Amino acid sequence: MRNHSLARTMRHALLGLALCLPMAKPVCAKQTAATTAHLRLTIVLVRHGIRAPTQPGSELDRYSAQPWPHWPVAAGQLTPHGRAGMQALGARYRLRLAPPLGLAASGCAGTEQIVTIADSAARNHASAQALLQGMAPGCAMRYQALPEGERNALFDGGKAPAPPVRLEAETRAQLAHLQAVLSACHHGRCATAPPTRLLYEPATRDGSPAAASTLKLAGGLAENLMLEDVEGFDAAQLGWGRVDRAAVAQLLALHNTSFAQSKRPLPVATAAASNLLAHLLATVQAAVGQTPSVAALAPPSTRLLVLVGHDTNLATLGGLLGVQWHRSDRPDDYPPGGALVLDLLERDGAPLLRVRTLMPSLSALRSGRLDDEALASSTLVLPGCHGEALCPLPVASAWLRTRIDPAQVQVALPAMQSWPVPP
């Protein structure tokens, strides 16, 4: 009897196991459906692609013993390599972001549910075009933007004074390293003809205007070295042959530190990003059937919204959201093609908000091969969401509204035009 009982128990156990085999997948899916969150909308704020330094060589040369390398495009413009990189990023976005939203991973069907908005700088226009060429090749895609050079308050918000700058010991060491590179120093001996202007004086006092201007300039010069690297300058040109890629990664900390002190603090971030955040929140609210108090950035039917902005937009919005995303394998917190992502999900009929990043590696930017491993994704937790990465939308919305300065918010969107994407 005991053996018969054991046999029946085993048959029941095997039957239960069979219910979870592939042929019985719908049964198991039904059991877990209540805990599955479904994507309804993804919003991507992405930095434009690889560009030339924004200052012409004649200005940069004042800070270096040797002329800066020549670029294939004018100051601040997207390079051909940068355009190709944004096309590759667009193709990766389509493969990675579209299917979870119920959109096809290729072809033109459903592309009307993809909306793209770009800032008015020429590099942003060009980046938006390249991104959409990669995302939907051969399709009649369009993006929204103001004409080149016109101020767009979504990307160029208000201004506020930054707090006094502190130069910590590590930052001072990085400044001294960068100054040695600029001054053509080797083993303590420097070029006989020094730069016209020095970047860094060790006597610079914390909190002084000189500290602020030094860190801002250093961040920009360090980023120029990164841009040389990812553009593919050879070893003899990269930092005049005085830095390798590891040194560039170390010096990039100056750019991160500069933004940490000048862009992310709330007085600055609140003024700069309140308008953008208000319209992002309105877009999410409209997608769940609510009536926002300011204009949404896209119709409620939109599944993927991409905004092509700048590193400053990532920094100020990140500061306003109260999130950090530095990773040791991604030395630049704001690389070309780097993005902050807002996901609207639904679970058991309740809307949820998730914040994450998609950051390309410098090697991927250099090669132009933006495969899935090249984009590092980190999920971030809003401080007002009590440790929940999937934050109930009412909770997230209530906290985000406390971060927005109404005086900085414009109810209507800028009068952007619709631009066709060249074939």
What are these regions (language model features)?
Residues M10-R11, A24, R47:
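Residue-level micro-sites within transmembrane alpha helices that shape
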Residues V27-Q31:
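Boundary at the C-terminal end of the N-terminal hydrophobic targeting segment
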Residues M23-P26, P100:
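N-terminal twin-arginine translocation
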Residues T32-V115, D119-L305, D311-P423:
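Signature for phosphate-centric chemistry
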